[in-house]
Each structure stands twice: as structure tokens, then as C-alpha cells.
Amino acid sequence: MDRFLQGRTALVTGSTSGIGLAIAQALASAGARVAINGLGSAEQIEAALKSVTDAGSESQHFDADLRKPDQIAHMLEAVQAWGNIDILVNCAGIQHAAPLAEQPPQKWDDIIAINLSAAFHTMQQALPGMAERGYGRVVNIASVHGLVASQNKAPYVASKFGIVGLSKVAALEYAAAGSRDSGGVTVNCVCPGWVETPLIEPQIQAHRNGGSRDDGVRALLEEKQPSLRMSLPEDIGAMVVWLCRREAHNLTGAAMPMDGGWTAQ
């Protein structure tokens, strides 16, 4: 891979597994030093770090409970001491499926805190430095549910619509920062549909109807994703890396679906 991000530092939240880890690996392959953040045992975190360094760059884990603004602030300070944050990817996310009337209030609070408020706090600290240096990329991993709604996902949908709106505001505020030569500062959302990760396994099982796992996958896709294909985490990683290119300097404020036609219906 073209190591065009050599000398850049990236922070990817929620990057010890799944989509976030694939993004961290892709950025490392492109030459960026990558700060990872996320949950897991010491062994899992060590394995994630090794996979990122094996992809071609230096990596370090920075811990923080993303429900707590003070811990987020301390994490950003530690990452900035390690290297200026040139690329910020907010990927951490949780969900809880239940009818609106049955959603536990604590689930609402946690989902909004991790999926939306944490991104606000990281962006608020990282964007001014990006603007000063003339280059910066914020990529918020939203969801197709930041563009359309589904039943039984009120907190998740609210958080993802919120992060799309937050990203548009930040994109407008920083649109004139930097130049084409420096790369500019952009803020965008990637909005995946179904992606092959452990997060969707309960929904696959719920669609099996006594059949195989493959039957469950097909039923899940037939319901909403016309391509009948799952995205893979590395597909999302490739999109994030492309958004970091200088040629993407004028692509900002976008919410880009990677959903196999879900939102085209």
C-alpha cells in the first residue's frame, strides 16, 4: 500500500476489535502511527496492538471510559503528547435492541454517551490543532441508522442521526482551514449497513427461523440490503484511508452510505 500517511498520527476509538481494528490496521498500512482505544483483556489488547504494528506502523493503546468526559480529556492529552492527532476516527459504539417503551433509561444514557457525546469531546479537543497545522481528518463511523430508522433501536438511531448532524456542523466550521496543498481539514461520516462483525450475530441468529446461520444471514440481508452482501470490516478501513488522502480535501460534511443500496430504496 502507498504509505502516504507516513509521519501522521491517528487515534481510532473502539479499535481493539471489529471495524475499529480494521480501520487501525488500514491506517497503519498507509504509514500512520495509530493510537488504539477500546475494551478487552490484556491479551486481547496486546493482540490488537500486534496486528496493527504488523500492518506496518507504531501503535500504542490508550485507555478511557468513553462515558466519562474527564477520562476522554486525559486520553486526548496523552495521545497528543505521543504525537499530534492528524486523524481522528470515532468508531466506538454500543447498541441495545428493545421497543421504545421497554428501553432501560441507563441503556439510553450509555448509548448516547459512547456513540455521540464521546465523539463531541474528542472532536472538540482534536480539531483546533488540526486547523492550526492545516491538515486533519475526522471520520465518524455512523451507520445506515444515521440516515434511516428501524424499530426497536431508539437510542442507537438517535445517537447515529446525532453524529451525522454533529459532523455536518464541524465540517462547516472547519471547511476553510488549511489548503489544497496542506490537505485541509475535513469531517465526514461513513454509514455502513450490515457488516460482518460479532455485533450483529444476535440479529443473524434471530433470523435463522430454525435454519442454518447462512439462512439467518440471507434473511437479514433480504430484509433491507439489496446487494445481499455483507460488507467486511476491511472495506470500511479502505474507505477511511481514502478519505485521508489530499485529493479528498473538498469532501467534507458528507454522510456516505456503504449499505448495498439500503438507503436507495
Pin down the residues of each PLM region.
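Conserved glycine-rich cofactor-binding loop
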Residues: 9, 16-17
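C-terminal substrate-recognition "lid" of short-chain dehydrogenase/reductases
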Residues: 120-123, 127, 131, 135, ...
